């Protein structure tokens, strides 16, 4: 079984990584498993990290973030080392003003509860990728939500096709090519669970909507989602019908 959370010693670079907009223009149908280059949806080098475990010699004050099609990377700028988190390991991700909250599967590297915050004083990462994509924390959160959704749908399609035909599916359902046809920053991600009302929770910029519940996590209120499929996903005017999996939630 592949390790879902692991230490890495090389960060994404311009040689092995392309922006999602460039990928959309050349290859509108996303195959998460068989691309020879990483696809980057959001990144930035002005962040800090806190976690519920001892990070040993790692300095969490200055980190860079990379949201790729394959995984989410936290890069420790002062240590020149990173932690790669596979999307199936992310149980919950939430946004609270200037913080991203992650609950990930049990591991021996970075702990299970992670908070990422903006840090304008973070040490500069000289990676040229940041000249192409330098994202705000809200964009990072939206990118994690979007790619997590792709992986959830891909996993379910693999299961469904294997159950019917006896062979694994290689690609995401074709409906997701419509999702890939627009720029991520225009994401309008809305949904409604069975036990929720019609109230929509808006991001600070008033653009993005999320349906969910409030849950007290002991130190703050966070709007977020669990890994799931929604019945409909509206992505910049393109509507794609997706199969239903886990419900979307908002922490109280």
From Swiss-Prot:
One cellular-component annotation, GO: nucleus
DNA-binding is among the record's keywords: no
State whether keyword Transport applies. no
Please classify the protein's predominant subcellular localization into one broad category. cytoplasm
Compartment(s): Cytoplasm; Nucleus
What keywords would UniProt list here? Cytoplasm, Nucleus
User: Record's family?
Assistant: Belongs to the LOT5 family.
Query: What protein does this entry describe?
Result: Protein LOT5
* Species this protein is from: Candida albicans (strain SC5314 / ATCC MYA-2876) (Yeast)
